[in-house]
């Protein structure tokens, strides 16, 4: 017999199972001394600052003048204009007698 066999005279036993730790009582919920006050701003928020005012919109180039597809044709009359008709004939002008006396007769 070896030395180890002489020492063990009874069969080996598993180690004892440790019981779970027991708390004396459940933990109480944490107590706040008082409710938290609302956050206080030191000053009102400043208005947002834009880096610079917006530039006016830029067109790529000025609009070209409108182009007609072709020049307009001259207006066409549907019928020729009639010759002007005089309503009455002008009477022949005769110098009055006093006028004839003032003017010398023309030499032809």
UniProtKB/Swiss-Prot annotation:
Belongs to the cornifin (SPRR) family. Its main location: cytoplasm. InterPro entries: SPRR2. Expressed weakly in uterus. GO terms for cellular component: cornified envelope; cytoplasm. The keyword Protein transport does not apply. One of its GO terms (biological process) is keratinocyte differentiation. It is found in: Cytoplasm. This is Small proline-rich protein 2H. Cross-linked envelope protein of keratinocytes. It is a keratinocyte protein that first appears in the cell cytosol, but ultimately becomes cross-linked to membrane proteins by transglutaminase. All that results in the formation of an insoluble envelope beneath the plasma membrane. Residues 1-11, 87-108 have a biased composition (Low complexity). Sequence repeats lie at residues 21-29, 30-38, 39-47, 48-56, 57-65, 66-74, 75-83. Residues 1-22, 83-108 are annotated as: Disordered. Keywords: Cytoplasm, Keratinization, Repeat. The lineage of its organism: Eukaryota, Metazoa, Chordata, Craniata, Vertebrata. Residues 21-83 are annotated as: 7 X 9 AA tandem repeats of P-[KQ]-C-[PT]-E-P-C-P-P. Pfam families: SPRR2. Residues 12-22 have a biased composition (Pro residues).
């Amino acid at each position: 017999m070896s030395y180890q066999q002489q020492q063990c005279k009874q069969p080996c036993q598993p180690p004892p199972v440790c019981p779970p730790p027991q708390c004396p009582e459940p933990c109480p919920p944490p107590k706040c001394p008082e409710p938290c006050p609302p956050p206080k701003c030191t000053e009102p928020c400043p208005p947002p600052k834009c880096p610079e005012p917006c530039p006016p919109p830029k067109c790529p180039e000025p609009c070209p003048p409108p182009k007609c597809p072709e020049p307009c044709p001259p207006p066409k009359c549907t019928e020729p204009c009639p010759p002007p008709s005089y309503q009455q004939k002008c009477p022949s002008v005769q110098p009055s007698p006093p006028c004839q006396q003032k003017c010398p007769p023309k030499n032809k």
